[in-house]
Amino acid sequence: MKKKTVDDVSFAGKRVLMRVDFNVPLKDGAVTDDIRIRGALPSIQKVLSDGGCVILMSHLGRPKGKPVAEMSLKPAADRLAELLGKPVQMAPDCIGDEVKNMAAAMKAGDVLMLENLRFHKEEEANDPEFAKSLASLGEVFVNDAFGTAHRAHASTEGVTNYVAESVAGYLIGKELTYLGEATANPVRPFVAILGGAKISGKIDVLENLLGKVDTVLVGGAMVFTFFKAQGYNIGKSLVEDDKLELAKSILEKAKTSGVKFLLPTDVVLADKFDQDANTKIATIDSIEDDWMGLDIGPETANCFREEVVNAKTVIWNGPMGVFEMEKFAKGTMAVAQALADATKQGAITVIGGGDSAAAIAVAGLEDSVTHVSTGGGASLEFLEGKELPGIAALSNA
């Protein structure tokens, strides 16, 4: 179901309540990474250039339902003011009479930042009265926070019940376009790269994508659960013993659905989980007892690269190894580079948030792929084929 976006509405003379994702890292009261604030600028500027005023709301951190001074959104408001080149008023709270009066006094072009939503436990509980109080501040609701779209909270889902119109901002629109198009109408060959430590976190994604993709490339520690299920010795590698049957059934399903399901042929082994560990490369049938696999090997990296550069649509979710340690980052960096090269050749390449987004940033290639999703959990649930409450609640186009 297509949703209305900010382009379907004129905000002239309107007070617009906008949910943004300003959950940014802070150090000494200043924002250390403003990528999420920059991401919200196009939607904010659309409202202002139409002649409306905008009331922004967000959460930051996990204050557990009470005010925590270090989790104030004031530093985010200050950074936004610098980026917009205009003042941003900071509200003392997100509900209450003082906030209501501040909102009522706004004029076209004004920007007001509400204080951290999660200073109130009612936000995550999706409390109707709390949602109604938030909704009363504006006339139109814009959701531009994809990172929380999989949560039915007061500011993402609840408010939509009390405003006349709820639309998607540019960021959410972009997510729906790329994640949606990639999974619903992919240009083939369609390759999914799945990594990370555990099968349990990716079961639903695997199940959903097996019917849609041409090839699945699997890396990260979850490969060892597949290997053990096939009878290989995996040494001290991470394994989910309670998921061995599941691993077998996924391998079986891949076979019957005609999907090319590629596991590594070699791995980088370490004698301990440490940057200064001794390392060696081994084929998967020669892993010794006291060693653990912490990355895909060079042969696998080349094989995966080949699949990626020949693809027309690629989705990547989860690293190939412990990329935070340089010794075990080569596999992940090789995949990141392959995605950049595939993009140059015209492929649609989508990075599904979370650790893969961090990895592509470490590789310095975030601008060399089609789209880096801003939501870790949200993009995962989207790839699992689930409807996201924050999106479902928006007005249909």
UniProtKB/Swiss-Prot annotation:
It catalyses: (2R)-3-phosphoglycerate + ATP = (2R)-3-phospho-glyceroyl phosphate + ADP. It is found in: Cytoplasm. ATP binds at K202, G293, E324, G353, G354, D355, S356. InterPro entries: Phosphoglycerate_kinase, Phosphoglycerate_kinase_CS, Phosphoglycerate_kinase_N, Phosphoglycerate_kinase_sf. One of its GO terms (biological process) is gluconeogenesis. The keyword Transcription regulation does not apply. The keyword ATP-binding applies. CDD domains: Phosphoglycerate_kinase. Pathway: Carbohydrate degradation; glycolysis; pyruvate from D-glyceraldehyde 3-phosphate: step 2/5. Pfam families: PGK. GO terms for molecular function: ADP binding; ATP binding; phosphoglycerate kinase activity. It is an enzyme of class 2 (transferase). Substrate binds at D21, F22, N23, R36, H59, L60, G61, R62, R118, R151. Keywords: ATP-binding, Cytoplasm, Glycolysis, Kinase, Nucleotide-binding, Transferase. Its EC number is 2.7.2.3. Transmembrane segments: none annotated. GO terms for cellular component: cytosol. Belongs to the phosphoglycerate kinase family. PANTHER family: PHOSPHOGLYCERATE KINASE (PTHR11406), PHOSPHOGLYCERATE KINASE 1, CHLOROPLASTIC-RELATED (PTHR11406:SF23). Monomer. This is Phosphoglycerate kinase. It comes from Chloroherpeton thalassium (strain ATCC 35110 / GB-78). The lineage of its organism: Bacteria, Pseudomonadati, Chlorobiota, Chlorobiia, Chlorobiales.
